[in-house]
Amino acid sequence: MRIGISVFTHAGQNVWENGLGQNVFYLARLLRTLPFVEEVLLLNCGDQSHLPDDVEPDGAGFRLIAPQDTTDLIDVAIEMAGGLDVNWLDQLRSKGKKVVYHCCGQPYAALIEPTIFGKEGYSSRFERCDEIWTLPRDRCFHPMLESLYRCPVYDVPYLWEPAFLERRATLLRRDHAVEFGYRPQPRKEYTFRALRAAVLEPNISVTKTCSIPMLICDAAFRANEDAIAELHLLNTIQMKDHPTFVHLANSLDLTKRRKVRFEQRHDFAGYMSQFGDAVVTHQWQQDQNTLYLDALYGGYPLIHNSKWLGSAGYYYPDADIPSGACRLIEASRNHDENFDSYRRSASEFLAALSPLHTMNQTAYSRSLLRLTSVRDRRAAC
């Protein structure tokens, strides 16, 4: 079996722009290990002839080819990080090839937000694929997707590995003499460690914004000023003059005490290595995120509302701000002392996400074999 996965290339690209760009290579690496997969190609949906420099060596061994040039080179096309031309997909399917749309974003938000908020969004003809694959977090949207795309929808495992993070950490150490990862301090030096809390939500969708984390950090500061040294709000420069955001930010005690920094977008490892000690997050119906995994791998206290993470990090339910504040204060008091057990718990969780984990390889093998065993899904009722 020969498989093509879509990627989007553009000038000035780097792998830290979003998690999706990394996920392509996690999937490609997994598929290449399957015994019945002969080759994995990258379908170039952009305007560059090469992958970003920071993708190497993860991109090594994967040919980057324009989709139209792979018609006779692949048996399965996976639309993932770049939109594929529907006429070409029709041609593929007419030849008996299979097409999968791997939906990694939150599908309801992607459908609704562009219309309501006047945002640009990618759109293509719905009836273009044989199956849709989603991450387990989006299982509740399967009926919606089946209705829209007129094809079956299935879960596939979330994949992650630390290769990109480790490479970035190596560059930071070599070029800037800074170390990635949380650095515990001897307990005798403090009762509550004054944490530099970082909020790294992208603020481009209602599913992941900084509002709840801001309130959690401020509630923690009001309850115990010794627990919070600073609040760093990344991806907020574009909102700093919006009246609603200004009103929210100015209401915080942290702002009144000049302890808030409003920042543009930065890569996780580069920023946390220099300016952060803890990560405070919030999500709505999108609890599988690369940010969480990067934070756990670095040993940083992760205050989150993701049930998916289980016992990893510091969990608070839903949008429970008092609970989140208590977990942040708990991290301030106990994280250094419990650092080793925190790292062990995180490592156990992260290991299960590896593209080389047998359970993940088995799940994707079954998905591909199911996909290619059905002659014509469109005829089914």
Please place each PLM-identified region on the residue numbering.
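Extended catalytic core of nucleotide-activated donor transferases of GT-like folds
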Residues: 6-10, 25-131, 138-143, 263-268
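Catalytic binding pocket for nucleotide-activated donors in carbohydrate/polymer assembly enzymes
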Residues: 274-354
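A short, active-site helix/loop in glycosyltransferases that binds the activated sugar's phosphate group
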Residues: 111-180
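Conserved catalytic-core segment of nucleotide-activated headgroup transferases in glycan assembly
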Residues: 20-23, 158-255
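A charged, aromatic-enriched C-terminal amphipathic alpha-helix characteristic of glycosyltransferases
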Residues: 335-381
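Nucleotide-activated donor-dependent transferases that construct or modify glycoconjugates
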Residues: 1-17, 195-202
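Donor nucleotide-activated moiety binding/catalytic core segment of transferases
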Residues: 239-297
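Short internal beta-strands
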Residues: 39-45, 134, 229-238
